[in-house]
């Protein structure tokens, strides 16, 4: 599986290259050359799989440059009951009248963004280690995205996080989540202004090619 830019100015690249690039060089988003097809029989065979193994089955259609055994190990490391405080990872809680509630806030920061970020933390470390390189990630947040990213990437080899946030404009809970982390690869930067101004700084930095 290779990826192309939505703006058409990038040669096809595999998943691991796209992972480390962020935006495509032409400023577009990376999208699959084609969407994988999954048959009804395959979907039925996935029924009842543990969440980590289901995640592997889906991601293996997109991250085809990562060996299957390695990718399965990454999903199983990302989605554990110790991290998500639930054996089901995304527990389904029955309500009245045949309705159920799907829990997406069982992760370390209680935000649904933990679902994606925990896998990203594992796969970033995996790819960077095998390429013997490092990566600096600069982001802007008004709360839950920054927390989820920092908790997923804390302590990971080869990656450093620099997270900008608007000074005094996050909840006390979100500030405590982010600013209490003491990991050497996590750096919180409070920006005097609103979130958009913090995001503008990140966008300006992304235009600098060293």
Features from the language model and the residues they span:
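Active-site-proximal loop->helix
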Residues: 147-189
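Short coil/turn connectors at secondary-structure junctions
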Residues: 26, 96-98, 132-135, 156-161, ...
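N-terminal entrance/gating region of PLP-dependent enzymes' catalytic architecture
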Residues: 30-110
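Conserved small/polar residues in nucleotide/adenosyl-binding loops
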Residues: 208-210
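Charged, compositionally biased N-terminal leader segments and the immediate start
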Residues: 1-26
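Well-ordered mid-protein domain cores that form the structural environment of catalytic cofactors
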Residues: 99-155
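Accessory "access/gating" subregions that flank catalytic or transport cores
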Residues: 190-194, 200-201
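Cofactor-binding loop segments of dinucleotide-utilizing enzymes, especially the Rossmann-like FAD-
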Residues: 140-142, 164-166, 193
């Amino acid at each position: 599986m290779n990826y192309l830019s939505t703006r058409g100015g990038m040669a096809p690249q595999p998943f691991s290259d796209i992972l480390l690039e962020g935006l495509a060089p032409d400023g577009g988003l990376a999208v699959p050359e084609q969407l994988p097809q999954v048959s009804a029989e395959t979907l039925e065979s996935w029924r009842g799989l543990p969440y980590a193994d289901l995640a592997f089955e889906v991601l293996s259609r997109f991250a085809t440059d990562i060996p299957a055994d390695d990718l399965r190990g990454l999903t199983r490391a990302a989605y554990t009951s110790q991290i998500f405080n639930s054996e089901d990872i995304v527990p389904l809680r029955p309500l009245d009248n045949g309705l159920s509630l799907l829990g997406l806030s069982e992760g370390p920061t209680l935000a649904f963004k933990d679902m994606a970020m925990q896998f990203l933390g594992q796969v970033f470390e995996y790819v960077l280690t095998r390429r013997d390189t490092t990566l600096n990630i600069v982001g802007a947040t008004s709360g839950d995205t920054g927390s989820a990213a920092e908790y997923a990437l804390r302590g990971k080899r080869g990656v450093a996080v620099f997270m900008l946030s608007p000074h005094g404009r996050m909840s006390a809970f979100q500030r405590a989540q982010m600013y209490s982390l003491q990991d050497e690869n996590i750096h919180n930067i409070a920006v005097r202004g609103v979130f958009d101004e913090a995001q503008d700084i990140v966008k300006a930095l992304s235009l600098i090619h060293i």
